[in-house]
Curated annotation (Swiss-Prot):
It comes from the Bacteria. Pfam families: NusB. It comes from Trichormus variabilis (strain ATCC 29413 / PCC 7937) (Anabaena variabilis). Belongs to the NusB family. This is Transcription antitermination protein NusB.
């Protein structure tokens, strides 16, 4: 955490805050950030527990299937798929738990470093005020998919990156790399690859329009 730059911490705070916004985001100030993050911590804690419960249930079902099957290929394949799904659920929960360890420090840094708070608030405000344009850019880069159907954490990571590309003049490559790192911490097992692919297409489209 100590080696991370203020803007990296701010992105993480913005990501954690997006799902906990007040009804009128224009009134959002730096003082709101700790409360937003705390509310998100509570939400994520419940999500982690649900994910672990789902993983445990999948493991039990796959184990039962293996024990009761008579080595039939269909049963073994089903059990294997269930086991893989359980492992995926567990990995997602582990990622979330690992990130949650740093939440108290994130809140402290937001209070201590004004640059962190200002940039996080700027990101959140831009995403809310320009959401239509940002989502349109993301949608154009999705293949047979809609923004509204994405997992919320993936959708918010994409919105942060596109907001930085479009409105904060952050180089595309930097925005993409930062989004991928966020996805590795908060998204599912394949989330960072998906986000990288979408943002690469956004970047290519921007370059094509500027020619």
């Amino acid at each position: 955490m100590q080696d991370r730059k203020p803007q990296q911490i701010a992105r993480e705070l913005a990501l954690l805050s997006l799902s906990q916004l007040p009804l009128n985001p224009k009134k959002l100030t730096e003082e709101h950030l700790p409360k937003l993050v705390l509310a998100t911590v509570r939400t994520l804690r419940a999500e982690v527990q649900d994910t672990l419960d789902n993983a445990a249930a999948e493991l039990q079902r796959s184990n039962d299937r293996l024990l009761t099957s008579q080595t039939r290929a269909s049963d073994l394949n089903t059990a294997r798929n269930m086991l893989q799904e359980a492992i995926s659920h567990t990995q997602t929960a582990i990622n979330q738990l690992g990130a949650s360890v740093e939440f108290p420090e994130l809140i402290q840094l937001a209070n201590q470093d004004k640059e962190v708070g200002r940039y996080a608030i700027k990101l959140v405000k831009i995403i809310n005020e320009e959401r239509g344009m940002i989502d349109e850019q993301i949608t154009s880069a999705l293949v047979d998919w809609q923004v509204t159907r994405l997992a919320q954490i993936d959708r918010d990571i994409l919105r942060i990156a596109v907001a930085e590309m479009m409105f904060l003049n952050l180089p595309n490559s930097v925005a993409i790399n930062e989004a991928v790192e966020l996805a590795k911490r908060y998204s599912g097992d394949e989330g960072h690859r998906f986000i990288n692919g979408v943002l690469r297409r956004v970047s290519d489209q921007k370059k094509a329009l500027s020619v």
